Amino acid sequence: MTLVAGIDSSTQSCKVVIRDADTGVLIRSSRASHPDGTEVDPEFWFDALQEAIAQAGGLDDVAAISVGGQQHGMVALDATGAVIRPALLWNDNRSA
């Protein structure tokens, strides 16, 4: 059986599904929450990704991965690529 993974990092959580590539049958899945609010430290997203992958049994037996994520957020980086402030999410309406 060939397994494929889908990963979705939304505003609220990171979700992982592992499916049989031939039948589409769900083999295993998991979800790890993101913090509430309109600003978030991007490190939380990475932590949630790692947690969701671990809870789904890992990816060692997976042949392919597809990733989707929330958009309309901004992560500010310095010249070295380091995060300099919490990410501003799409639901921040302070400038509306």
UniProtKB/Swiss-Prot annotation:
Keyword Kinase assigned: yes
Enzyme class label: transferase
Chemical reaction(s) catalysed: D-xylulose + ATP = D-xylulose 5-phosphate + ADP + H(+)
GO molecular function, one term: D-xylulokinase activity
Annotated site (Important for activity): 8
The keyword Nucleotide-binding is assigned to this record: yes
UniProt entry keywords in alphabetical sequence: ATP-binding, Carbohydrate metabolism, Kinase, Nucleotide-binding, Transferase, Xylose metabolism
Entries under Pfam families matching the protein: FGGY_N
Residues noted as binding substrate in the record, renumbered to the chain: 71-72
EC number(s) per entry: 2.7.1.17
An individual GO BP term: D-xylose metabolic process
Disulfide bonds: none
Function: Catalyzes the phosphorylation of D-xylulose to D-xylulose 5-phosphate.
Family recorded in the similarity comment: Belongs to the FGGY kinase family.
Identification of the protein by name: Xylulose kinase
Organism of derivation: Arthrobacter sp. (strain NRRL B3728)
Gene name of the record: xylB
